[in-house]
């Protein structure tokens, strides 16, 4: 399948069910790709889900169904508010390799520029070479590692930090 017929939009609290659906799908389908666990999110109240939409969340919809997600978490400190972290990155398996991830990242980047973000950052598992290569193709560079940054099933996995300048 290609990414044609997919609509990407910044969602609001009125679309909390779509957010919940795609986020839980992501955590269930790709548990090693996220620092969070399915069980941590499954128990959230509806209000907690709504509260998480205080930060920008973009969802890709195909025929009204959520098929991808990316979020943006802006730094709070006034001296760091020009930076934001890309979070919750997930594309349904059948749509990977179609350009949908690029389109979601473009939507996030455009929104970030519009709200004064100058640098995007993200963390990715050192074991996820496919994601690392994708981010490199999109202009991200590794800027550091946290040895054993993620503990999964008793195993310590390095967390790779990457960044991309949006301006300057």
Question: What do these predicted regions represent?
Answer:
Residues 5-7:
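Extreme N-terminal starter segment of soluble prokaryotic enzymes
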Residues 98:
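Flexible nucleotide-binding loop
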Residues 1-3, 50-51:
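Short, conserved catalytic or adaptor-binding loops enriched in Gly and charged residues
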Residues 49, 101, 123, 129:
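Contiguous, function-dense segments enriched for cysteine-driven chemistry
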Residues 118, 125-132, 137-144, 148-168:
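C-terminal "cap" of GNAT-fold acetyltransferases
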Residues 10-21, 25-94, 105-107, 111, ...:
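Acetyl-CoA-dependent GNAT
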């Amino acid at each position: 399948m290609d990414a044609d017929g997919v609509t990407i939009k910044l969602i609001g609290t009125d679309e909390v069910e779509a957010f919940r659906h795609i986020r839980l799908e992501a955590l269930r389908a790709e548990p090693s790709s996220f620092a969070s666990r399915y069980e941590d999110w499954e128990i959230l109240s509806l209000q907690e889900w709504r509260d998480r939409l205080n930060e920008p969340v973009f969802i890709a919809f195909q025929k009204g169904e959520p098929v991808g997600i990316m979020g943006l978490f802006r730094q709070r400190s006034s001296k760091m508010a020009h930076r934001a972290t890309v979070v919750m990155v997930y594309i349904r398996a059948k749509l990977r390799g179609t350009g949908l991830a690029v389109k979601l990242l473009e939507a996030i980047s455009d929104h970030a520029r519009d709200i004064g973000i100058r640098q995007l950052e993200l963390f990715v598992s050192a074991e996820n070479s496919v994601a690392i290569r994708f981010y490199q193709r999109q202009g991200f560079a590794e800027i550091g590692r946290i040895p054993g940054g993620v503990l999964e099933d008793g195993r310590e996995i390095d967390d790779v930090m990457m960044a991309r300048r949006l301006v300057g």
